[in-house]
UniProtKB/Swiss-Prot annotation:
Region: Disordered, residue numbers: 1-28
Miscellaneous field: Present with 656 molecules/cell in log phase SD medium.
Composition bias, Polar residues: 16-26
Domain of life from the UniProt record: Eukaryota
First-listed, main subcellular location of the protein, grouped into a coarse class: cytoplasm
Keywords on record: Cytoplasm
Name of the protein in question: Uncharacterized protein YOR304C-A
Lineage: Eukaryota, Fungi, Dikarya, Ascomycota, Saccharomycotina
């Protein structure tokens, strides 16, 4: 079989990818979430939870202290 026929083929070749598909892929890169983005969101969420837990703990400690103070006053 001769390769001349393959090289000189007049048949139009289909593109490997549709140009509208490649354009939409380029536009979709803005919507891609990276592992770094996820790690940052998780870290931010954990810090928010930690801050809220500290605030709750401080409020609870103040409440316990107030109860103890009242009990001490009553026992005198």
């Amino acid at each position: 079989m001769s390769t001349e026929k393959l090289e000189a083929s007049e048949e139009p070749q289909a593109p490997l990818a549709n140009t509208s598909e490649t354009n939409s892929i380029k536009g979709d890169t803005e919507n891609i979430v990276t592992v770094f983005d996820l790690a940052n969101e998780i870290e931010k969420s954990l810090k928010d939870v930690q801050r809220q837990m500290k605030e709750n703990d401080d409020e609870f400690s103040r409440s316990i202290q107030a109860i103890e103070d009242k009990l001490n006053k009553m026992s005198r």
